[in-house]
């Protein structure tokens, strides 16, 4: 899948789940399950409840996503 086809949204971490999964409430009100991208995992970027994050989603499954950036 090409990078241009990804949907990029912002949201807030609502809940922490096992295996570096998170429940994210998007700015449009939807709640999705998201995991950390490989680079964030490699560099040990910590994500806590309440952090603002940038999430990439596939247009085929709008209930799952990948966290690509943690806002300061």
UniProtKB/Swiss-Prot annotation:
It is found in: Cytoplasm. InterPro entries: NA-bd_OB-fold, RNA-binding_domain_S1_IF1, S1_domain, TIF_IF1. Keywords: Cytoplasm, Initiation factor, Protein biosynthesis, RNA-binding, rRNA-binding. GO terms for molecular function: ribosome binding; rRNA binding; translation initiation factor activity. Coiled coil: none annotated. Pfam families: eIF-1a. GO terms for cellular component: cytosol. SMART domains: S1. Its main location: cytoplasm. Residues 1-72 form the S1-like domain. Component of the 30S ribosomal translation pre-initiation complex which assembles on the 30S ribosome in the order IF-2 and IF-3, IF-1 and N-formylmethionyl-tRNA(fMet); mRNA recruitment can occur at any time during PIC assembly. Belongs to the IF-1 family. One of the essential components for the initiation of protein synthesis. Stabilizes the binding of IF-2 and IF-3 on the 30S subunit to which N-formylmethionyl-tRNA(fMet) subsequently binds. Helps modulate mRNA selection, yielding the 30S pre-initiation complex (PIC). Upon addition of the 50S ribosomal subunit IF-1, IF-2 and IF-3 are released leaving the mature 70S translation initiation complex. PANTHER family: TRANSLATION INITIATION FACTOR IF-1, CHLOROPLASTIC. HAMAP family: IF_1 (MF_00075). NCBIfam families: infA. This is Translation initiation factor IF-1. It comes from Alcanivorax borkumensis (strain ATCC 700651 / DSM 11573 / NCIMB 13689 / SK2).
């Amino acid at each position: 899948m090409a990078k241009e086809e990804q949907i990029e949204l912002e949201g807030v971490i609502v809940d922490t789940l096992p295996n570096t999964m998170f429940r994210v409430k998007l700015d449009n009100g939807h709640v999705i399950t998201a995991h950390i991208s490989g680079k964030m995992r490699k560099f040990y970027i910590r994500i806590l409840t309440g952090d603002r994050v940038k999430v990439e989603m596939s247009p085929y499954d709008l209930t799952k996503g990948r966290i690509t950036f943690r806002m300061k």
